[in-house]
């Protein structure tokens, strides 16, 4: 392969650095072949999800997202469900759309006054409202037991946000 050719044309005494977003066996073997006394440095541990959580993906276009969400909500036993949106303005839009469809929910995001956020959390924790629509930033600050479902209305921008979002459920194992 190309890497063999490149390596043959390099000086024998050199510093060689490999960088990879993912480290699978193939990448590690390449490192062992071309680097003397390799050192592995990981910037952060890989994020992973709990095996106690059942995860599903439902593909739909933007035009059908709301209908799909309504269908999901009508077909699951909604105990405590958190719906995540990527932007605060989308939380308000989704709240309004669900209200028009007679689906009760509450909003939870950083622009709400602290008293309103606490009120929303209390309403959710007490079971007075079973659907909480949240942003990632606000969602990081919540600690609620017995969340039955997490719905990503918007695909998270980074994988860490996905892991954090679904980590809201499945804590008890």
Predicted regions and their residues:
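Conserved helicase RecA-like core
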Residues: 1-173
């Amino acid at each position: 392969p190309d890497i063999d050719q490149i390596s043959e044309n390099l000086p024998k005494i050199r510093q060689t650095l490999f960088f990879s977003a993912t480290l699978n066996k193939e990448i590690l073997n390449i490192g062992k072949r071309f680097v003397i006394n390799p050192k592995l440095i990981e910037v952060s541990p890989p994020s992973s999800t709990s095996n106690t959580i059942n995860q599903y993906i439902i593909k739909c276009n933007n035009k059908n997202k709301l209908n799909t969400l309504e269908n999901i909500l009508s077909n699951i036993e909604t105990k405590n469900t958190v719906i995540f949106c990527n932007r605060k303005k989308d939380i308000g839009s989704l709240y309004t759309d669900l209200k028009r469809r007679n689906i009760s929910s509450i909003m939870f995001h950083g622009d709400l006054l602290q008293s309103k956020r606490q009120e929303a959390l209390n309403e959710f924790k007490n079971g007075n409202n079973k659907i909480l629509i949240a942003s990632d930033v606000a969602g990081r600050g919540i600690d609620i037991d017995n969340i039955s479902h997490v719905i990503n209305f918007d695909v998270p921008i980074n994988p860490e946000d996905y892991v954090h979002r679904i980590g809201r459920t499945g804590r008890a194992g």
